[in-house]
């Protein structure tokens, strides 16, 4: 089975839905942000603060190179992974990429008490969300499938991903 790759903006449900998909299919979940945290032995916030976004993205690329070679797993990526076309190509070689969409307003609601997101720290959170989403949306739109997490519970989103994936797999 091809990997199920989840991407989308922070707060779109990648980790939660990824966990549900992995549980239902009885396969492993690989969270690229967790892998980066293990490598640096720092939180994402600390990595950005100490090393900057450039070093974070370099490490993210190494992690993508490694996890994209795995088989039969769910891969939950960081929201900015799509900004590097090479990351997308690597993930697509052995996976199907699902973009988890959430509106800026819902992302704000989901992240309102979360102060660990380095790209949302300065200025108005909603403005930052909208600005970053506008930059990333063309990249997200290149994913294989879009799942709207505004209108689906995590459980229903997981079921929809599994349904799409199994239908796609049966045609291979």
Curated annotation (Swiss-Prot):
Pathway: Metabolic intermediate biosynthesis; chorismate biosynthesis; chorismate from D-erythrose 4-phosphate and phosphoenolpyruvate: step 5/7. Its EC number is 2.7.1.71. It is found in: Cytoplasm. Substrate binds at residues 33, 57, 79, 136. Mg(2+) binds at residue 15. Keywords: Amino-acid biosynthesis, Aromatic amino acid biosynthesis, ATP-binding, Cytoplasm, Kinase, Magnesium, Metal-binding, Nucleotide-binding, Transferase. Gene3D superfamilies: P-loop containing nucleotide triphosphate hydrolases. Pfam families: SKI (PF01202). One of its GO terms (molecular function) is magnesium ion binding. It catalyses: shikimate + ATP = 3-phosphoshikimate + ADP + H(+). Binds 1 Mg(2+) ion per subunit. ATP binds at residues 11-16, 117. One of its GO terms (biological process) is chorismate biosynthetic process. Its cofactor is Mg(2+). The keyword Kinase applies. InterPro entries: P-loop_NTPase (IPR027417), Shikimate/glucono_kinase (IPR031322), Shikimate_kinase/TSH1 (IPR000623), Shikimate_kinase_CS (IPR023000). It is an enzyme of class 2 (transferase). Monomer. Belongs to the shikimate kinase family. This is Shikimate kinase.
């Amino acid at each position: 089975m091809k990997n199920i790759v989840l991407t989308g903006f922070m707060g779109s449900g990648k980790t939660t839905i990824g966990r549900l998909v992995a549980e239902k299919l009885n396969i492993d979940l690989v969270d690229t942000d967790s892998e980066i945290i293990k490598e640096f032995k720092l939180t994402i916030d600390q990595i950005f603060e100490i090393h900057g976004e450039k070093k974070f993205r370099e490490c993210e690329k190494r992690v993508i190179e490694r996890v994209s070679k795995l088989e039969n797993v769910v891969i939950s990526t960081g929201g900015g992974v799509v900004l590097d076309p090479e990351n997308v190509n690597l993930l697509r070689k052995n996976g199907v990429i699902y973009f988890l969409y959430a509106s800026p307003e819902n992302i704000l609601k989901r992240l309102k008490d979360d102060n660990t997101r380095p790209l949302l720290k300065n200025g108005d959170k909603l403005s930052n969300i909208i600005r970053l989403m506008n930059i990333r949306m063309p990249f997200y739109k290149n994913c294989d499938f879009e799942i709207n997490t505004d209108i689906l519970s995590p459980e229903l989103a997981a079921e929809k991903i599994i349904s799409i994936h199994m239908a796609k797999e049966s045609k291979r």
